[in-house]
Amino acid sequence: MYAIVESGGKQFRVEPGKVFFTERVVGKGEGEEVKLDKVLMVKTDDGKVLVGKPYLENVEIKGTIVEHGRARKVIVGKFRPRKNYRRIKGHRQWYTAIKVEEIQVK
């Protein structure tokens, strides 16, 4: 069984027992339970596919926050030839790792 959920403006394929990385979830600590309510699609174990318009109302996905962290640094550089102009800037994006506990179809 798997589901397609929307979190942080992006879509993820999630399965029970798997961990996925999304944009930072503010207000929740590590070990706390979260509910993912923006479910776009679910495929059950017997092959039945449920598609929402845009979201499914009768599906509930429960997960646990594993960690909050920051991704690897992305280096951005500006350069102008022959003018001795070079600027380098780094960025590290915050993320939240969520482990999916169960997918319930009501």
From Swiss-Prot:
InterPro entries named among the record's database cross-references: bL21-like (IPR028909), bL21-like_sf (IPR036164), Ribosomal_bL21 (IPR001787), Ribosomal_bL21_CS (IPR018258)
Function: This protein binds to 23S rRNA in the presence of protein L20.
GO cellular component: cytoplasm; ribonucleoprotein complex; ribosome
GO annotation, biological process: translation
RNA-binding in keyword set: yes
Keywords associated with the record: Ribonucleoprotein, Ribosomal protein, RNA-binding, rRNA-binding
Alphabetical list of PANTHER family matching this protein: 50S RIBOSOMAL PROTEIN L21, LARGE RIBOSOMAL SUBUNIT PROTEIN BL21M
Superkingdom of origin organism: Bacteria
Keyword rRNA-binding: yes
SUPFAM superfamilies for this protein: L21p-like
Pfam family, one: Ribosomal_L21p
Protein's UniProt name: Large ribosomal subunit protein bL21
Organism, scientific name: Thermosipho africanus (strain TCF52B)
GO molecular function: rRNA binding; structural constituent of ribosome
Assembly and oligomerization: Part of the 50S ribosomal subunit. Contacts protein L20.
Record gene name: rplU
Family in the record: Belongs to the bacterial ribosomal protein bL21 family.
